[in-house]
Amino acid sequence: MTQLMITGDGNTPLSPEELADLIPNLATREELNEWERENILRAREWAVGDRTGSNDMVGDEYVGKLHQKMFDQTWKWAGQYRRTERNIGIPVQEIREKLVALFGDVRYWIANQTFSPDEIAVRFHHRLVAIHPFPNGNGRHARLMADLFLMKLGRPAFTWGSRELVRQGEARARYLDAVRAADNGDMQPLLEFVRL
């Protein structure tokens, strides 16, 4: 097993086939995290300048395009929905159907002001993570989607516990606990965490 295949709590393991689609020549998980971080920073810069409105970003095309921008220098499959089952997320054949339902729900929540903008963004993030549409990067993608959604509404991006969440540590553990609470219907811990 290579160092790249070793995952921590909350990290999605990749298949050997998915690992073979790594673009740069990296040997360790730390190198991969740093490479992806740089790729994501470029994607964030692109997304902040993008003129897509909040309603239009809640759709299949934008979700895939953002993931592609976030990982296009890292993975050949960037922006493509996963084709293999995971220890997290829904069955592969349900991904598109569940995303369409999520997009409809978010648009309804916006139009009817069902929840505050923060709660809509948290629920959007949580459902994206639960669906787990991509082979890797789902949490980072969902967090950036939530931040961009808020910014399009003129609100500040979330702080996400004011810590780096990719590496193992107290902030990541608290984030994962909040996501698991949301899995059980309690959104409050995640709502609190995103504004710490």
Regions found by a protein language model. Name each.
Residues M1-L196:
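FIC/Doc superfamily catalytic core
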